[in-house]
């Protein structure tokens, strides 16, 4: 972490904390190393963007070989879809209440969207939210053993 300490020393007194500092070269090496390890084992990578919430980092991950991204909520999925991400998995079960159903339906117009579900009622509610085209939305059934 000498490189990190050098950067902190140079910035001392010039930035307010807390502040994110990303060492782009280190991050890129980590992305590439993770992807290489997974690819060597035949494992598809779908990173969770809730950690970084950064389109540029998501692009780097997909460019390195990730099959898509995982979002934590409809809003994250919308932001990444608007930035051109075409394969998104919503990891947390979503109940399509309020505006969520329409937002999910719109996402499926431009994005391969999959949503994790953990009960039959959620599947029915999501299908209803999709109107005449429930087949445009894919669901992943989550089983908690």
Region annotations inferred by a language model:
Residues 16-24, 43-48, 63-70:
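Active-site mouth loops of central-metabolism enzymes
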Residues 2-7, 26-57:
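N-terminal glycine-rich anion-binding loops that anchor highly charged ligand groups
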Residues 8-12, 37, 67, 116-118:
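Bulky hydrophobic/aromatic packing residues
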Residues 3-22:
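Generic N-terminal amphipathic, Lys/Arg-enriched alpha-helix
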Residues 5-6, 11, 41, 45, ...:
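Generic preference for well-ordered secondary structure
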Residues 48-145:
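Active-site-proximal beta-alpha core segment in soluble small-molecule metabolic enzymes
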Residues 21, 25-28, 98, 117:
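Conserved phosphate-coordination/catalytic loops
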């Amino acid at each position: 972490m000498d490189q990190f300490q050098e950067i902190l020393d140079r910035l001392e007194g010039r930035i307010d904390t807390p502040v994110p500092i990303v060492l782009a070269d280190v991050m890129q090496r980590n992305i590439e190393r993770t992807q290489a390890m997974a690819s060597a084992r035949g494992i598809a990578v779908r990173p969770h963007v809730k950690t970084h919430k950064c389109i540029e980092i998501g692009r780097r991950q997909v460019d390195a070989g990730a099959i898509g991204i995982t979002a934590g909520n409809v809003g994250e999925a919308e932001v990444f879809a608007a930035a051109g991400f075409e394969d998104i998995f919503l990891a947390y079960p979503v109940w399509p209440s309020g505006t969520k159903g329409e937002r999910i339906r719109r996402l499926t117009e431009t994005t391969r969207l999959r949503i994790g579900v953990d009960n039959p009622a959620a599947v029915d509610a999501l299908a209803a939210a999709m109107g005449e085209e429930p087949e445009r939305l894919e669901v992943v059934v989550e089983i908690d053993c």
